[in-house]
């Protein structure tokens, strides 16, 4: 994929895990989708680890 230079870090390593989302601040709609997808996958991972 493309080499994104912008990133946002969400969460903390001790509270469900930190994720870093890369994207392009010049394309906010695309970046928002990447963030939403990453948060959804992070929640799924936490749920799996907790046995939910």
What are the residue ranges of the model-derived segments?
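Compositionally biased, non-globular sequence tracts
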Residues: 1-52
């Amino acid at each position: 994929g493309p080499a994104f230079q912008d990133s946002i870090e969400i969460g903390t390593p001790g509270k469900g895990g930190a994720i870093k989302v890369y994207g392009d601040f010049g394309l906010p709609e695309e970046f928002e989708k990447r963030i939403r997808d990453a948060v959804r996958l992070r929640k799924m991972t936490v749920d799996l680890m907790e046995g939910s």
